[in-house]
Amino acid sequence: MEQFGNFYITTPIYYVNDKPHIGHAYTSLLCDVVARFMRLAGKNVKFTTGTDEHGQKIEKAAKARGMQPKEFTDEVSVSFRELAKSMNFQYDDFIRTTEERHEKAVIALWNRLEERGQIYLDSYSGWYSVRDEAFYQESELIDGKAPTGAEVQWIKEESYFFRLSNWQNKLLELYENQPNFIFPESRKNEVVSFVRSGLTDLSISRTSFNWGIKVPGNDKHVIYVWIDALTNYLTSVGFPGTEGEEYKRFWANDSSSNVHVIGKDILRFHAVYWPAILLAADLPLPKQIAVHGWWLSEGEKISKSLGNVIDPIGLAQEFGVDQLRYFLLREASFGQDGNFSKKNMISRINSELANNIGNLVQRTISFLHKQCSGIVPTVDQSLLKGEESLPNCKAILDKAMDHLSKYEFNQIILLIINISSEANAYIDKSAPWMLSKTDRERMNLVIYKLLEYIRVIGILLQPIVPKSAEMILDQLQIPKEQRDLKSLCNACISLGITLPKPTPVFLRVETKEEK
């Protein structure tokens, strides 16, 4: 991921046929963490999410509930806002595809494609999955089902088509000239293989249902839900207006980064169809499609039939919002599948958050109060060298931002854990409780260095566990304006100030054995 001054990051808009699950929470969390890091780095950030509310699947789900589609989507869309609130996601815009601004954007994009001869009317016959809202070729079916396991049905109807086949070579050029356009590389290779195998024109309208945006000039047709959904990335920056400030700043700007973060199940729509549509409409492309894996539950695929669907809101209430955020980022490597286990989650909370970081904060500030009445001691800065050197903030920050550029969230966390472990080992080695009797000047030095360790940890933790990091920095009395990444290297804890008595930041989770 490139890190320009303007930074636009998006989740896919979520399909509202059911309640939010752990996959939705994870995608949004990744975007939220990146957005928070970028804000701390002084970037101009826009983070968007939303709900995809049109299509046959929604129409069926609403009918099953005895509701009108709009009434149904109004209800379920709220649950995705509640997820964002419960997980402390700081988005800047929430797009609903039923909004008027979005319909205008979709129609404008359709018209651009039509004006450029990229759309034609014909008839379609083939396999279609209502669950996936996707068309599949015969060769893609596995045991009569979609590659995702979804049921498919044979449909034949009049349809508008997008000339996708015209853009095969341009797409291959894009992937070659911009090697990081699809990340990680394994997903890029998957897409390149698919495109090289040959592209056929894409059916982009349906006549067998009514719930959607009508094709301009032919309201018998509804625009294909994925054309509708993908356009949200333009809607949020003010399209169809191409002269607006947000469009110019976040989309049509070589010195901006715009990243779509998605799950691997919707890779083809974002990495093949979307750039082809934008190229055909003569519109700028996103800079990157970042693709994460799925979550498994105790090693098994999550599904309603297995009864192992994971409710993120329930988990946040049970263990804490920051604890859940931490675990999801710590446990999974970006691009690979993660395995959810309550046992592992409790282990991470207790060993890394409570026993390591939480213990460091508690024991350091408690000792400060016991020996110095809570006053940060004045130290001779010339003594902070060699083994007594302060943490190398620049090297730490460079590592963290390098990991961020590759979405290595678990490596950022490991970096922080290592800093905390180093600080705890320093306490044991320095034995400040002994120095209090023999060398108080050195004791003061040890305390000051430990407080600096904690300051660095607190600043780096802000995007990951925002509330807990705020508690840490508040206990150090770090001014709000000194909590950004620039201040990580350019500021330090104030001498002579009195810190409040410590408040536990991370509590242990009692295990069954302990109970």
Describe each region flagged by the PLM.
Residues 1-6, 46-50, 101, 122-127, ...:
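Basic, alpha-helical terminal appendages of large translation-related enzymes
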Residues 2-121:
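N-terminal Rossmann-like or analogous alpha/beta NTP/dinucleotide-binding catalytic cores
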Residues 2-49, 101-105, 148, 152-370, ...:
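Structured secondary-structure scaffolds
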Residues 33, 71-82, 356-363, 395, ...:
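A non-catalytic, amphipathic alpha-helix used as a structural packing/dimerization or gating element
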Residues 87-96, 114-127, 139-140, 154-155, ...:
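Short secondary-structure capping/junction motifs at helix and strand boundaries
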Residues 116-168, 172:
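Cys/His-rich short segments
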Residues 267, 328-331, 335, 344, ...:
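Active-site-proximal binding-pocket segments
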Residues 349, 353-356, 360, 385, ...:
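Amphipathic alpha-helix face/heptad-repeat signature
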